[in-house]
Amino acid sequence: MSEQEGNQSEHQSEHVGESEGKLPNETPTTSQSTNASTGTAGKGEKKSSDGDPAAANPATKLTPSMAESLLELNPALRSELAGMDKEKATEALRQMNISDLLTGLSVNPKNQKDMASFKFWQTQPVIRFDDRESESPDGPIKIVELDQVSREPIPLVDGFEWVTLDIDDEADVKEFYELLANHYVEDGSAMFRFNYSPAFLNWALKAPGWKREWHVGVRASKSGKLVASICGVPAEIAVRGKSLKVTEINFLCVHKKLRSKRLTPVLIKEITRRCYLNGIYQAIYTVGIMLPTPVSACRYYHRALDWLKLHEVGFSPLPIGSTKSRQVTRNHLPGHTSTPGLRPMQSKDIDAVQDLLNRYLKRFDLSQIFSRKEVDHLLLHKEKPGAEQIVWSYVAEEPGTHRITDFAAFYSLESSVLQNSKHKNVKAAYLYYYATETAFAEKEKGLKERLLMLINDVLILAKKERFDVMNALTLHDNPLFLEQLKFGAGDGQLHYYLFNYRTAPIAGGVNDKNLPDERKRGGVGVILV
């Protein structure tokens, strides 16, 4: 399962194998555009005519010089087309879905590093860039013969050995936490770093059906120090209506001083081997950079809950012509929620939430299918003395009938502030899953209005819990409310990948200008923590 690494501002190598060894699913809260005024992007630009093929697919207008620039930003794509002359490469690009590809590029060019030895990726069952327009049906790229899968671990370079991380062992969890804290994802300016607490790791890595052998570590043989990791958890997803048992890959991390040891491809091969032995032949993962080949790409958006603090830590700049007090006022939220019957989720709501959420998610081309146990583990906080809360979930209960009509959740992932004398952390909430019965009305009548009210209430509740920012992607039905609820565009992109499964590109909620577009909904409906 090819979980990748990155060094990106919203989740981001030289080579796979010589790279920075990091692969997150979210990113530290860094944005130079957060909560600048929204709604003005694209003014003065002409809309493409639906009847103009060139307008519909910008690739048809590519010149050789434009193609050269595109390839410069895409080491992966450049590797795929190596050996072609400029005209042939340009023609090859014209045949690809460049509109989707451009939308999928990170907004920040410095995030486009080569994850390379694409010799490695060419050996893996992943979609090639030049296969985007393939007429091949959806399905596995490679049929795995279980009797040909090695029972022995992939050999490591001398001086290192495989270990299984014990998430139940306090010492192991502490060491894993320290590896991630010091060597996992930072933003591009090295101002923020994820702070994965032991409680978060237990929540993320011990979902129902979790397997201890999928928590893979590498130690230095002499010192016993943990120097690398890659993890997986089982899940069931639906791809265009077809159910798949997959592994969600996460926490690929290599110690900064060991990124010349070619550990990354070995980690990928080893987690793949272990999953194959358990009869799981597909995986899903998210990366902030472009690799072969994303099935979708979503953009990050951020909503300030404590704008002044975000400004003081360097997250939210002061827009030209504005003042601090004006920005604080602009981001003010009401003191009370508006959704009738809204209350914290309880254990008695599990069945109703599972039913509502799964029906809601069926509307998307790529979505998770939740079991009752997964709803219980991932979406319901259990009150325990001294226990850290990771997820906050709410339901709207209809008066009289007591029917659950709405559900919404967010989870917490704190980021450490690395270079600030006043603040040591940013408390970030991530918009998680939500669902509403309004989605099933004819022509989705009232859906936008309902979500504007429901998610605004989520912002209010997160503010009351003293969160500083709410992060969200352009997936689910988020394009209906992001800009109106004052979410600001971030500088990061999150690409979705399927390992050993081919499907056509899936909408990521953004248009060709990389802006939220209500017409681009219905694509991504799965969130990897």
Swiss-Prot record:
Reactions mediated catalytically: N-terminal glycyl-[protein] + tetradecanoyl-CoA = N-tetradecanoylglycyl-[protein] + CoA + H(+)
Alphabetically ordered keywords of this record: Acyltransferase, Cytoplasm, Transferase
SUPFAM superfamilies: Acyl-CoA N-acyltransferases (Nat)
Entry superkingdom: Eukaryota
Subunit structure: Monomer.
Entry EC number(s): 2.3.1.97
Residues reported in the UniProt entry to bind tetradecanoyl-CoA: F118, K119, F120, W121, L252, C253, V254, S260, K261, R262, L263, T264
This protein's name: Glycylpeptide N-tetradecanoyltransferase
Protein's job: Adds a myristoyl group to the N-terminal glycine residue of certain cellular proteins.
One GO cellular component term: cytoplasm
Family: Belongs to the NMT family.
Compositional bias ranges of the Basic and acidic residues kind: 11-23
Residues forming the catalytic site: V529 (proton acceptor)
Residue ranges of coiled coil: none
Enzyme class: transferase
Keyword Zinc recorded: no
Name of a matching Pfam family: NMT
Region Disordered, residue ranges: 1-65
Chief location: cytoplasm
Residue stretches spanning the membrane: none
GO MF annotation: an example: glycylpeptide N-tetradecanoyltransferase activity
Keyword Endoplasmic reticulum appears in the UniProt entry: no
Localization per Swiss-Prot or TrEMBL: Cytoplasm
